[in-house]
Amino acid sequence: MQLVIVTGLSGSGKSIVLKMLEDSGYYCIDNLPATLLPQASEHLSQGNHQRVAISIDTRSASLEALPGNIRKLKDEGIEVQVLFLEANVETLVKRYSETRRRHPLSSDTSTLAESISHERHMLEPLVDLGLRIDTSSLSANALRNWVKEFVTQKNGELILLFSSFGFKHGIPLDADYVFDVRCLPNPYYDPALRPQTGQDKPVCAFLEAHDSVQNMYDDIRGFIERWLPNFIADNRSYLTVAIGCTGGQHRSVYLAERLAAHFRRQEYRVLVRHRSLETN
């Protein structure tokens, strides 16, 4: 049985993800208490459900039981994948204001921002259970596409995720490492290159003509190659490397694509995401 556990902050998109998984043929359960996960998994596996998605959030009692229960399920041979969704405070406040919904931890004595902060603290032990996705600048469609690719990945070795972004949109919350490449020559100032991206050959040619770009690439690649074995030895499922330029269109995209291609050739499991391009 393949089991996808969806957790994270309220308002970060868990309902969107669960609906997408349901439309993709998963048997879905919303807001299952964490303590009931082993019993639910046993019952569902006996019922010949091959693909199951379960949402668990702060409304669930005994969240602290979740990490241990996930380890037990993996030991029993169940393929478990965990998605942790989050967003920055400004985005969550805006979403709640637009929908006029009440935060599950809200009270007469706390503000919405305080409720969000309290929930983030409660969920802190779950952050590193699987793949973190910062949905702050993601459209619903982009989130669906990210999750679709995630659930098609088989459990096993660490997955290396390269994510380009624009600093003007904010640093993504889900990054393990952030590299700032704004010091590199900027194709934006060439009118012919401005509407293109770091995936286009003219932009690649422009960047490859500068030694500083090659040096930056070599340094980032060398850093990852040096420390990646340590993350693998630590049994990490994912390592997210974020590369940022000003707008997330040219330099960061080029380097993310080039690094992803290099590590694929080394036979690592690699995903690549372009936050600003997918937002636009």
From Swiss-Prot:
- Positions that bind ATP: G8, L9, S10, G11, S12, G13, K14, S15
Gene3D superfamilies (UniProt xref) = P-loop containing nucleotide triphosphate hydrolases (3.40.50.300)
What domain of life does the UniProt record list for this protein's source? Bacteria
GO molecular-function terms, A-Z:
ATP binding; GTP binding
Do the record's keywords include GTP-binding? Answer: yes
Q: Where does GTP bind?
A: D57, T58, R59, S60
Q: Which UniProt keywords apply?
A: ATP-binding, GTP-binding, Nucleotide-binding
Q: Which InterPro entries match?
A: P-loop_NTPase (IPR027417), RapZ-like (IPR005337), RapZ-like_N (IPR053930), RapZ_C (IPR053931)
Biological role: Displays ATPase and GTPase activities.
The record's comment on protein family reads: Belongs to the RapZ-like family.
Cited HAMAP family: RapZ_like (MF_00636)
Protein name, as recorded: Nucleotide-binding protein Mfla_0145
Source organism per UniProt: Methylobacillus flagellatus (strain ATCC 51484 / DSM 6875 / VKM B-1610 / KT)
- Read off the lineage from the record: Bacteria, Pseudomonadati, Pseudomonadota, Betaproteobacteria, Nitrosomonadales
